[in-house]
Amino acid sequence: MKFLPILFLMIALNSPIYAQKLNFSFNHVAISVTDLERSCTFYKEVLKLEEITNKTKVEGIRWFTTGNGIELHLISTIKERVKINKAVHFALSTKDFDKFIQNLDGKKIPYSDWPGTPQKINVRADGIRQVFLQDPDGYWIEVNSVS
């Protein structure tokens, strides 16, 4: 009987504590912007994102949906400059890639392929077409066609 607690302890310690998998889903990307109205206009008019209710109710923050429960949050309350490079970007996919490119061209919004060739569409090895553009604060955005 003395060994029963010891046996129980050995079994408990032998069982992995991490056995249950944590399931995550992507919720949002938040970016710091210098001019909230200018950025909102860009995301509404260029990327055609739908503005949704900012559930924090905090002034200087606006929320947009990209669909499927994924959001973009624009935050103008932080005044520190953000160092930006092309490797730090978010990507969107669209079935209307050609229409999107026409919209960029019509608004004279510059875009490029990954190496940076202006107004050039990159075609990946899997056939997906993509371009890169920057928002008013210099954040890089990748837009892909859908296979």
Task: Locate predicted features.
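Bacterial Sec-dependent N-terminal signal peptides
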Residues: 1-22
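N-terminal beta-strand motif that seeds the catalytic metal site of vicinal oxygen chelate
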Residues: 17-37, 88-92
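Vicinal oxygen chelate
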Residues: 35-37, 90-137
